[in-house]
Amino acid sequence: MLTFTTLASGSSGNAALVSCGDTHVLLDAGISARRITTGLKSLGVDPAELSAILITHEHRDHVSGLAVLTKKIRPTIYAAPATCGQLADQLPHGAELLQSRLPGAGFAVGELWVEPFATPHDAAGSVGYVLSGGGRTMALC
């Protein structure tokens, strides 16, 4: 079953968990790594078992916890090319985890099919994601 749980939402930080079976994907990491790991654990998800992190854009309220989080866990981080370029300089312990994906270029993450799509925003390379799994589909941005 495909599930979505908000860990935080708003101008002070954004992070959410999307799960399908044993696949767990973090959407944005705009809160502290401690809040992310505490939130995941409260949902019964070991942070080390995250399948991937999907980043919508490089603004602080979407990535502020990413640098510390990637010191502790090592999931692949997917983002649009422009966002990957911005994040590479901010992730001294995680730049090698970045995987660039163009809007419209779908890819698999465990039991999920992920398709990025362009979104209008003042951040270069801003994307949302359509996630499909377990017979369900959701769009997030």
What label would you give each PLM region?
Residues 1-43, 127-141:
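Conserved beta-strand hairpin/beta-sheet module of binuclear metal-dependent hydrolase folds
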Residues 2, 45-48, 93, 112:
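Structured loop/turn residues at beta-strand edges in well-structured enzyme cores
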Residues 8, 29-31, 58, 82, ...:
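Active-site metal-binding loops of divalent metal-dependent hydrolases
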Residues 14, 23, 49-51, 73, ...:
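A generic structural signal for short beta-strands and their flanking turns/coil linkers
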Residues 21, 70-71, 92:
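Short glycine-enriched loop/turn motifs at secondary-structure junctions
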Residues 81-135:
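Metallo-beta-lactamase
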